């Protein structure tokens, strides 16, 4: 399981040092092979272990290239998809187009989301968390059947 939020400094080449607690698991789970793409709803990146990404690709493959919305989704997610491999020091190289899309500079946040990570600029992450917390009192919790029975 991928969870937690970790502040990480990108090096000058755009490499992200994956926290030690995930390195062994990623090497065991997917031989250190990952895929990074853009998030179409937020200014961040999505980083999937290869086995998880392959499930996403199956879903994308089932979409119709004739439907403009489905085609746009395929184009963005697959067009930006970039294979990444953990190097010997547990780092991943994030391509310049991906870093540019998410506005990544020096300080980033690696945020576990169960089956994937989100990669945010630290500034945007803090803004997003602030917005999410402020929106909580106004949310309609009955909107989703899954949320209706959700408790912490």
Swiss-Prot record:
Q: Which GO terms describe its biological process?
A: negative regulation of DNA-templated transcription initiation
Question: Any idea where the SpoVT-AbrB domain is?
Answer: 5-52, 81-124
Predominant localisation class: cytoplasm
In terms of PROSITE patterns, this protein maps to: SPOVT_ABRB
Q: Which domain of life is it from?
A: Bacteria
One function term, GO molecular function aspect: transcription cis-regulatory region binding
Residue stretches in coiled coil? none
Could you tell me the keywords of this UniProt record? Cytoplasm, DNA-binding, Repeat, Transcription, Transcription regulation
Spell out the subcellular localization from the entry: Cytoplasm, Nucleoid
Summarize the subunit comment.
Answer: Forms oligomers.
Q: Which family does it belong to?
A: Belongs to the MraZ family.
Q: What is the protein's name according to its record?
A: Transcriptional regulator MraZ
> Source species, please?
Tolumonas auensis (strain DSM 9187 / NBRC 110442 / TA 4)
Per UniProt, what is the name of the gene that codes for the protein in this document?
A: mraZ
